[in-house]
Amino acid sequence: MVGEEKMSLRNRLSKSGENPEQDEAQRSVSDTQSNGRITMKQLIAKKRQLAAEAEELKPLFLKEVGCHFDDFVTNLIEKSASLDNGGCALTTFSILEEMKNNHRAKDLRAPPEKGKIFISRRSLLDELFEVDHIRTIYHMFIGLLILFILSTLVVDYIDEGRLVLEFNLLGYAFGKLPTVIWTWWAMFLSTLSIPYFLFQRWAHGYSKTSHPLIYSLSHGFFFLVFQLGILGFVPTYVVLAYTLPPASRFIVILEQIRMVMKAHSFVRENVPRVLNAAKEKSSTVPVPTVNQYLYFLFAPTLIYRDSYPRTPTVRWGYVAVQFLQVFGCLFYVYYIFERLCAPLFRNIKQEPFSARVLVLCVFNSILPGVLMLFLTFFAFLHCWLNAFAEMLRFGDRMFYKDWWNSTSYSNYYRTWNVVVHDWLYYYAYKDLLWFFSKRFKSAAMLAVFALSAVVHEYALAVCLSYFYPVLFVLFMFFGMAFNFIVNDSRKRPIWNIMVWASLFLGHGVILCFYSQEWYARQHCPLKNPTFLDYVRPRSWTCQYVF
């Protein structure tokens, strides 16, 4: 194949020299017509001909260079593998090969040092933004934000006769911040102290007790009580009892979920080390220091390690830019709600609930839903996590991969949020495979999907004050089906288009259904609601009063 391309390339390059007599005749005719002078018209035509030939040769040249580059990289990997087998120093290729072999091994519960490997690397968007063509897309979003601001100011000036610079929606959404702050401090201090104290007490007493199983089960029970009873219940009770607004609730609930996952990772990664030390009858107990655990609680990862790759310095200018972009995205979402969402759902209440209204609502919600998808990704997975990584000199910045190039949903789930995916993969999927054996791979995958769907729906139900399992149905049923149907074997560009189209439609459905239900509960309140009223959709039966 490469030989044919080389021959075709040589043929095209030598095409002009195949018939020198014919070329000479043409030149003589041209010279005769112009009386020995080359006219400007002929010069322009010749330049166009050369440009066309260059464009025709361009893809062939790139293919040939790509083939040579692939051969070079393949030879480099083979040489590196042969050096590793000869006993040379450990290289990146040997590490990857070892990871591959470990993944195929029978014992799927790898010890911490053979789990996720952290290396110093930049976030993908930081690298892409160095390319002018990609950075232009970033500039386009900034330009769109400016237009949203101007549109809001102009409309308010026309309607009110003055410039209205009020942010009532933001003030309402982030209300009762003092309650949020003391709740967060209570969660943080309990997560810092209780899991560490329980683990340290268990680790020092495990090798001394005469009943290690009972000793371990008792400490595991107390840890479970903390995870579910204290950290799992108290924050939920606070947001409901104090009737916090939606954004404030999201802060508390997402931090609650994050700390539960962090505490689980800390215990899960360190328990095997203590068991191995007791098995080898080591005199030292491998208990991490408080500083190591404290660093992990703030580090932008859910996988515990005693140490991580660190950058040499902190770029405070970079940190400031990331936080400014987070606030910019926050105002971006505000203007999307003001200009695209609020008018849409205010008009919906003028018609009774029907299939026609629902379909129109879904398709009108696609644009704001997609914009919020991009903004959520950029604000949290890129800006927020990179800001904390820079302040902590955390070296591994791979919080996401190129999910926008996904041609399958399985690849999208792996690359959209690498931070959460790593936790689900190592502590849910691999542990389930270790516990139930490799034969139940599909059941383990189903369990991971169910866990993720339940946690997502729990967060939305608590934060919005009603249970409306639209996300659960989309994620658990359609997402699970697409994971098997549109799998990794699909590589053609058409499948990337299908993934994008389904993502657009799905976010339109989510925004439409949840917003309709929110407005219905605002305009059709119940005097004495029962538990069933919190789980029964009110948008289906609400009769708006004008």
Swiss-Prot record:
The modification Phosphoserine is found at residue 8. InterPro entries: MBOAT_fam, Oat_ACAT_DAG_ARE, Sterol_acyltranf_meta. Residues 157-176, 241-248, 349-365, 465-470, 525-546 are lumenal. GO terms for biological process: cholesterol efflux; cholesterol homeostasis; cholesterol metabolic process. One of its GO terms (molecular function) is fatty-acyl-CoA binding. The modification N-acetylmethionine is found at residue 1. The chain crosses the membrane at residues 135-156, 177-202, 215-240, 249-272, 316-348, 366-391, 440-464, 471-486, 493-524. Keywords: Acetylation, Acyltransferase, Cholesterol metabolism, Disulfide bond, Endoplasmic reticulum, Lipid metabolism, Membrane, Phosphoprotein, Steroid metabolism, Sterol metabolism, Transferase, Transmembrane, Transmembrane helix. It catalyses: a sterol + a long-chain fatty acyl-CoA = a long-chain 3-hydroxysterol ester + CoA; cholesterol + an acyl-CoA = a cholesterol ester + CoA; cholesterol + (9Z)-octadecenoyl-CoA = cholesteryl (9Z-octadecenoate) + CoA; cholesterol + hexadecanoyl-CoA = cholesteryl hexadecanoate + CoA. It is found in: Endoplasmic reticulum membrane. The active site is at 456. Its EC number is 2.3.1.26. An acyl-CoA binds at residues 411, 414, 417, 421, 429, 441, 452. Residues 1-134, 203-214, 273-315, 392-439, 487-492 are cytoplasmic. Residues 27-37 have a biased composition (Polar residues). Disulfide bonds join 524-542. It is a multi-pass membrane protein. Cholesterol binds at residue 133. One of its GO terms (cellular component) is endoplasmic reticulum membrane. PANTHER family: STEROL O-ACYLTRANSFERASE (PTHR10408), STEROL O-ACYLTRANSFERASE 1 (PTHR10408:SF6). Each protomer consists of 9 transmembrane segments, which enclose a cytosolic tunnel and a transmembrane tunnel that converge at the predicted catalytic site: acyl-CoA enters the active site through the cytosolic tunnel, whereas cholesterol enters from the side through the transmembrane tunnel. Belongs to the membrane-bound acyltransferase family. Sterol o-acyltransferase subfamily. Catalyzes the formation of fatty acid-cholesterol esters, which are less soluble in membranes than cholesterol. Plays a role in lipoprotein assembly and dietary cholesterol absorption. Preferentially utilizes oleoyl-CoA ((9Z)-octadecenoyl-CoA) as a substrate: shows a higher activity towards an acyl-CoA substrate with a double bond at the delta-9 position (9Z) than towards saturated acyl-CoA or an unsaturated acyl-CoA with a double bond at the delta-7 (7Z) or delta-11 (11Z) positions. This is Sterol O-acyltransferase 1. The gene is SOAT1.
